[in-house]
A protein has these predicted regions:
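Short, amphipathic, aromatic/basic-enriched membrane-interface segments that mark the entry/exit
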Residues: 1-8, 24-29, 45-55
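Alpha-helical transmembrane segments of multipass membrane proteins
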Residues: 16-21, 40-44, 63-67, 139-143
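Structural signature of hydrophobic alpha-helical transmembrane segments
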Residues: 20-37
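Membrane-interface helix caps and helix-loop-helix hairpins in membrane proteins
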Residues: 25, 48-51, 69-76, 151
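C-terminal ends of transmembrane helices
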Residues: 38-49, 172
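Cytoplasmic-side transmembrane-helix entry/capping segments in multi-pass membrane proteins
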Residues: 51-62, 77-84
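Membrane-proximal helix-loop-helix units in multi-pass membrane proteins
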Residues: 72-121
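C-terminal membrane-adjacent module
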Residues: 109-186
């Protein structure tokens, strides 16, 4: 039997990204495409271990896609999707392992990373930041659509995660180094 690879955040992200793009472009066809992608993820990513966030994401995206398909309310479904995704990140901060740590801990000794306070603190901060970003994304998406400037969302909702990804890459190096040097009050 083949040994499974470590979890990949792509397992969680592929259904969400497909959902936000496909349902935004065409609610009816996009929701069907998203359901097909979500149902294929366990096969596509079969060589990787799954974590709870992968499983919850597949279920949440499938439910939101079904709602969009049945009601034609793609806008509301995608807005709720941003909220749910953000809440996943925030709720994970109430557990022993923030969402991002479930994936990146394997780069830092696996389960042993939980004993590293710098690793854990950094990941709790990043999980909270991603959670806040997506909860705010749900809010501004709803408000901008109501204000009639929904076209702006194409730029904003794609740019913000890119900027947050750049920030994450910087922060995960800078923050632990700063704490290790003792130059940050705790």
């Amino acid at each position: 039997m083949e040994v499974q690879k470590n979890p990949s955040m792509m397992t969680m992200l592929i259904p969400w990204i497909t959902f936000w793009i496909a349902v935004s472009v065409n609610t009816e066809k996009g929701s069907v495409i998203t359901l097909l992608v979500a149902s294929a993820i366990p096969f596509i990513m079969r060589k990787h271990k799954f974590v709870i966030w992968d499983q919850l994401s597949i279920v949440a995206v499938a439910i939101l896609s079904a709602i969009a398909s049945l009601t034609g309310a793609g806008d509301i479904s995608t807005d709720i999707g941003y909220l749910v995704f953000g809440l996943f990140w925030l709720v994970s901060c109430l557990t022993k392992e923030p969402l991002c740590a479930a994936y990146v801990k394997y780069n830092y000794g696996g389960e042993a990373a939980h004993k590293n306070p710098l690793f854990m603190k950094t990941n709790y901060i990043l999980a909270a930041a991603w959670g806040v970003l997506y909860v705010l994304t749900a809010v501004w998406t709803f408000l901008l659509k109501k204000a009639g400037v929904g076209a702006t969302l194409i730029v904003v909702n794609n740019l913000m995660p890119v900027l947050m990804g750049i920030f994450t890459g910087w922060f995960e190096k800078w923050y632990p180094a700063r704490l290790a040097r003792g130059s940050k009050k705790q």
